[in-house]
């Protein structure tokens, strides 16, 4: 597997609609204000988080169960700045919609701007032929409230192209998160 360059990413966007919307260069300023960057980089793509968040709460005294997940664990917010309570967790989603080619696996890493503030972004790999909005998991590891800025960069996707096509893609096995739109909760 090889990591793919900005040139390859641009071609995949043009020929396969791999990322939509797509920023062809790094965007660091919006309306004359500095922002957390997003857009195409040398060997990846920095995606933005939308203004749709689900923040974990304990007001309903529920238990987090991945096999029987309750929406009562969360508070929904549509905001420009999401404040995650200390040592807590929130879900968001990318603005960008991804369509992954059959011979590509995508890995996501966090942005250093957030990591240096104790905010960790986690995403499981985007598998071959998966498509949808990516649900982002934000963990505030600090004892202080932490801000996540909607419509700004949140994470970087790295595209790994295989020299072999997989026998069974995510689409072939009808994966449960296929074509997800919005913040998607755990499914079993």
UniProtKB/Swiss-Prot annotation:
Catalyzes the deamination of dCTP to dUTP. DCTP binds at residues 111-116, 135-137, 156, 170, 179-180. InterPro entries: dCTP_deaminase, dUTPase-like_sf, dUTPase_trimeric. The keyword Nucleotide-binding applies. The active site is at residue 137. Pathway: Pyrimidine metabolism; dUMP biosynthesis; dUMP from dCTP (dUTP route): step 1/2. Homotrimer. It catalyses: dCTP + H2O + H(+) = dUTP + NH4(+). GO terms for biological process: dUMP biosynthetic process; dUTP biosynthetic process. Its EC number is 3.5.4.13. This is dCTP deaminase. It comes from the Bacteria. Keywords: Hydrolase, Nucleotide metabolism, Nucleotide-binding.
């Amino acid at each position: 597997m090889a990591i793919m360059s900005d040139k390859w990413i641009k071609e995949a966007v043009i020929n396969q609609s791999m990322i939509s919307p797509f920023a062809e260069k790094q965007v660091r300023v919006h309306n004359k204000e500095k922002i957390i960057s997003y857009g195409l980089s040398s060997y990846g793509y920095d995606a933005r988080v939308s203004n749709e968040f689900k923040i974990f709460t304990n007001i309903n005294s529920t238990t987090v169960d991945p096999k029987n997940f309750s929406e009562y664990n969360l508070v929904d917010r549509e905001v420009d700045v999401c404040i995650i309570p200390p040592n807590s967790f929130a879900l968001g989603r990318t603005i960008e919609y991804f369509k992954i080619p059959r011979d590509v696996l995508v890995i996501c890493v966090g942005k250093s701007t957030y990591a240096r503030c104790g905010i960790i972004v986690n995403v499981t790999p985007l598998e071959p032929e998966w498509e949808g909005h990516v649900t982002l998991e934000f963990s505030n590891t600090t004892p202080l409230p932490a801000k996540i800025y909607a419509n700004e960069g949140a994470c970087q996707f790295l595209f790994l192209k295989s020299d072999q096509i997989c026998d069974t893609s995510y689409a072939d096995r009808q994966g449960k998160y296929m074509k997800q739109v919005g913040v998607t909760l755990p499914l079993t």
